[in-house]
């Protein structure tokens, strides 16, 4: 049975395919997959899912390997082998607030998709905050008055800037990572070794 | 009426398989001279959260009793049995148990286990007996396609001893090793030691495999007496298993303990078909230090839910239905006992007769009951 790789849809997918092609793998069926969420190549079965679902599929052994952003791993802490970083998907976690506005004197209100990371960040600082969980467009929260600031991932900072926000602290640096199911790595060691070695060669080349 | 998340009703084959797995386990235990032990399902939280046991209270099902103490549903057998065994006479060496554990960090709140604990026994004898008990039990369950993996807590301890890491750094490094997160392992060690030492410890992330890995590290560690002793010990256990017909034995030299009480060899069994962990365990002499006892202790626990899911029980009984009525029920019951080694059911109608191999009907003739096959 071919190893199964779960791949995060969207930007990570595009960057991974470029990286995968640079390792001399045929990515043609993956590029021209249309709306298919499951694509079989000569060597692997690929499944395409949202980042957090990639970790779920890998944790439960549906997929042997996964390609996922480290922000997802830090937030959800899945029980998987978190093998190594990949040379793409770089971003950082930042605390931001509205430009020109001061933080309130009392308890700060923070909006984020990453409530666990936010909670841990302020815990490390010894500060109690109110955290609001949002699913997207977190930049809106300070503008509309839901929160005093946000914790979110930042790549270029353009979205923050365009919405009138400024970064006040950067505290985690992320990239995409290769994860593995804990049993698969042992049981399918020989089948997975080749692709894992190829990924690592790709890192060295970088 | 609804059930809480993680709880479920179970019927039919699932329950049959689990009962069968427990039955076979008990039979194997009797024949291998284990004595049964059971501990209460409700315990004080401190039994499991103290510094020796080191379990996380957040993952337990807990409440305050009337005295304000925290009580929990048993989250782990080994710790509970250690508490119970310190009161037992040391001449009793081999113990077996079966029952549920309750934790929030696993799929489903309740999971069923069966396991063994061996105390006051020489190291190799205890560990060998644990592993060979696992081999026999899996054989009795007709499970042949599995992998047994060995590890040892002493490898991490020996390699990190010269680094003089703080407790926090040591925990971070152990966590990174547990996740095989090579970049973090390298970064932590490289900040405290030479690049060569960082490379050596990072290499442990990939040091898993079969006898080839054992032989490679026998050579690499030839000048370190402690590591050489460990690798030779693991080789002896692996050889014992292969001599007993286990096809797939491997080591993971980078495996670290996930509970503070492990202190030596660690075991894990995987079912190759699904990748599920079917047993795990190891040496935990340290657990007894909380009772000021110096005891050799080793054991393992089987995940009965995983094993039961994997069981394929062939039902070989003939299914017989006896159709009777209230007045002839006693006669039908008498008749039931004439069919030995068959599943026999008494019903008052024949509407389910398709579910049976043979159907008999009790009829009355001349004031006497007789039976007619349909």
Label the predicted regions.
Chain B
Residues 1-71:
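TRNA-binding/sensing appendages of the translation machinery
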């Amino acid at each position: 049975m071919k190893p199964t790789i779960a791949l995060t849809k969207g930007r990570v997918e595009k960057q991974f395919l470029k990286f995968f092609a640079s390792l001399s793998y045929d990515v043609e069926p993956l590029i021209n997959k249309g709306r298919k969420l499951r694509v079989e190549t000569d060597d692997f079965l690929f499944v395409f899912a949202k980042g957090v679902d990639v970790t779920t599929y890998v944790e439960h052994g549906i997929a042997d390997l996964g390609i996922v952003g480290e922000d997802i791993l830090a937030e959800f802490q899945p029980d998987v082998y978190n093998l190594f970083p990949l040379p793409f998907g770089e971003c950082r976690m930042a605390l931001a607030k509205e430009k020109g506005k001061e933080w309130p004197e009392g308890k700060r209100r923070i909006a984020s998709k990453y409530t666990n990371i936010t909670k841990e960040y302020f815990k490390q600082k010894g500060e109690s905050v109110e955290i609001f969980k949002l699913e997207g467009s977190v930049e809106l929260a300070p503008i509309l008055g839901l929160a005093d600031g946000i914790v979110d991932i930042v790549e270029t900072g353009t979205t923050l800037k365009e919405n009138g926000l400024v970064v006040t602290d950067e505290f985690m640096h992320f990239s995409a990572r290769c994860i593995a199911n804990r049993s698969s790595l042992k049981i399918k060691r020989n089948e997975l070794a080749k692709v894992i070695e190829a990924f690592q060669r790709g890192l060295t080349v970088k | 009426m609804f059930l809480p998340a993680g709880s479920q009703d179970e019927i039919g084959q699932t329950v049959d398989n689990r009962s069968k797995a427990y039955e076979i386990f008990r039979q194997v235990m009797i024949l291998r001279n284990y004595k049964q032990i059971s501990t209460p399902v409700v315990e004080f939280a401190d039994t499991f959260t103290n510094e020796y046991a080191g379990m996380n209270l957040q993952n337990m099902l807990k409440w305050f009793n009337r005295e304000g103490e925290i009580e929990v549903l048993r989250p782990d057998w080994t710790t509970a049995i250690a508490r119970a065994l310190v009161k037992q006479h040391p001449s009793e060496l081999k113990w077996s148990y079966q029952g549920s554990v309750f934790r929030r960090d696993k799929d489903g709140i309740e999971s069923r286990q069966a396991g063994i604990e061996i105390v006051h026994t020489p190291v190799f004898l205890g560990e060998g007996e644990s592993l060979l008990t696992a081999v026999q039990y899996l054989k009795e369950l007709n499970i042949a396609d599995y992998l047994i993996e060995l590890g040892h807590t002493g490898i991490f301890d020996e390699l990190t001893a010269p680094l003089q890491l703080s407790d926090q750094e040591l925990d971070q490094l152990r966590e990174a090793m547990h996740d095989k997160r090579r970049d973090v392992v390298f970064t932590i060690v490289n900040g405290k030691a030479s690049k060569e030492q960082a490379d050596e410890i990072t290499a442990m992330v990939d040091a898993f495999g079969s006898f080839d890995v054992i032989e490679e590290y026998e050579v690499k560690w030839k000048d370190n007496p402690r590591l050489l002793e460990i690798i030779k010990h693991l080789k002896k256990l692996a050889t014992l298993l292969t001599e007993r017909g286990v096809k797939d034995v491997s080591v993971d030299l980078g495996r670290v303990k996930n509970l503070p009480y492990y202190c030596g060899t660690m075991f894990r069994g995987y079912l190759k078909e699904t990748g599920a962990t079917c047993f795990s365990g190891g040496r935990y002499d340290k657990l007894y230090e909380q009772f000021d006892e110096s005891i050799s202790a080793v054991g393992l626990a089987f995940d009965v839910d995983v094993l039961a899911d994997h069981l394929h029980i062939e039902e070989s009984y003939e299914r017989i239905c006896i159709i009777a009525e209230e007045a002839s029920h006693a006669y039908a019951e008498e008749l039931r006992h004439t069919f030995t080694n068959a599943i026999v059911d008494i019903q008052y109608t024949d509407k389910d007769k398709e579910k049976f191999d043979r159907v008999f009907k009790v009829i009355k003739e001349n004031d006497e009951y007789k039976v007619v096959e349909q």
